[in-house]
Amino acid sequence: MSCCGGSCGCGSGCKCGSGCGGCGMYPDLESTTTFTIIEGVAPMKNYGVAEKATEGGNGCKCGSNCTCDPCNC
């Protein structure tokens, strides 16, 4: 998987930088799932969704030993 959010340095807990769930290795969050449903009549606003969707293929992924390989975000 690739790193999104503009940061590509592997941080603590095997995460690739800030704002990036690229390597998918979150040992402290593996079995935790939270769902929140908010119902209302206001229209749903999605700001920046298209930008995040196109950022996916930057070629930054976590390699062996929690290192980013390659790091070219």
Curated annotation (Swiss-Prot):
GO molecular function terms listed in the Swiss-Prot or TrEMBL record: metal ion binding
Keywords, ordered alphabetically: Metal-binding, Metal-thiolate cluster
InterPro entries named in the record: Metalthion_15p
Pfam family membership, one: Metallothio_2
UniProt keyword annotation of Cell inner membrane present: no
Keyword Lyase: no
Main function: Metallothioneins have a high content of cysteine residues that bind various heavy metals.
Family of the protein in this entry: Belongs to the metallothionein superfamily. Type 15 family.
UniProt protein name: Metallothionein-like protein type 2
Lineage: Eukaryota, Viridiplantae, Streptophyta, Embryophyta, Tracheophyta
